[in-house]
Amino acid sequence: MALKKKLNFLWTLVLYLIASRLPKAFGKDLPRVPTITDPKFIDAFLNIHNELRRKVQPPAADMNQLFWDQQLAKLAKAWTRECKLAHNPCIKQRYECLEDYDFIGENIYLGRIETQPEDVVINWYNESKYFNFDFNTCSEMCGHYTQVVWAKTVKIGCAVSNCPNLKGFSAGLFVCNYSPAGNFIGFRPYTRGDSCSMCGQKTCENSLCRPMNRKTPHHKAACHVLVLGFILQSLL
């Protein structure tokens, strides 16, 4: 009886040790999926969007600076979880996606889950080679580019989800939602002119129009997460 108990204990110990090492053994095969509250993820998408918006050619007189919007990010996250390589049908109707938002713009990218936000947005922006500003036409698909540089857009929220069997392979589905939406027929993405020359009551910050006293709330949210982490650590 004593021998049997000892063997059972040893088997339990062996199984525990194996289980405890599994994450270390296989963790590298499971890439981390950034969350919509991750400050690095947020800043990466924001910074590359704004960097490219201030570099448009011809220059833009009325290009707004983009700010992160958590409601748009939640909408993007919910849609990426569907793992469908298609646009969210709700963006076709006014106030359909979110109660207080009119039409919402959307860009989609399918690639590796490890793809960096900068590479995603640059991929969209590279469609600029197909866009003729003078005639406001596209020789090939360029709607992703025109949404990225749509001057009147001021809010953005992005997300990514791991889709294990999308189009026959495992992939990362990236979605960015924009408000106000761009790509209205008959309108150019921005007004040509000297940078910030049409900012109106807004201030000019590094070639982009920025509202007075505008704050970026996502850093505050990230701070709350850090404080909560310190509290939990102190309780352990």
From Swiss-Prot:
Pfam (any one): CAP
Tissues of expression: Expressed in testis (at protein level). Little or no expression in other tissues tested.
UniProt signal peptide: 1-27
Domain of life of the native organism: Eukaryota
Gene Ontology terms: cellular component: acrosomal vesicle; extracellular region; membrane raft; outer acrosomal membrane; plasma membrane; protein complex involved in cell-cell adhesion; sperm head-tail coupling apparatus
Ranges for domain SCP: 46-178
UniProt subcellular location: Cytoplasmic vesicle, Secretory vesicle, Acrosome; Cell membrane; Membrane raft; Secreted
Chain positions carrying an annotated carbohydrate: 126
GO biological process terms, semicolon-separated: binding of sperm to zona pellucida; fusion of sperm to egg plasma membrane involved in single fertilization; protein localization involved in acrosome reaction
Observed phenotype of the null mutant: Mutants have normal number of pups per litter, body weight, testis weight and daily sperm production. Mutant sperm have a significantly reduced ability to undergo the progesterone-induced acrosome reaction compared to wild type.
Modification after translation (UniProt): N-glycosylated. N-glycosylation decreases during the transit in the caput.
Principal subcellular localisation of the protein: cytoplasm
Keyword vocabulary terms for this entry: Cell membrane, Cytoplasmic vesicle, Fertilization, Glycoprotein, Membrane, Secreted, Signal
Family statement drawn from the similarity comment of this UniProt entry: Belongs to the CRISP family.
Role: Required for optimal fertilization at the stage of sperm-oocyte fusion, plays a role in optimizing acrosome function, the translocation of IZUMO1 during the acrosome reaction and the fertilization process. Component of epididymosomes, one type of membranous microvesicules which mediate the transfer of lipids and proteins to spermatozoa plasma membrane during epididymal maturation. Also component of the CD9-positive microvesicules found in the cauda region.
Subunit structure, interactors included: Part of a oolemmal binding multimeric complex (IZUMO1 complex) composed at least of IZUMO1 and GLIPR1L1; the complex assemblage is influenced by the maturation status of the male germ cell. Interacts with IZUMO1.
Protein name from the UniProt record: GLIPR1-like protein 1
Originating organism: Mus musculus (Mouse)
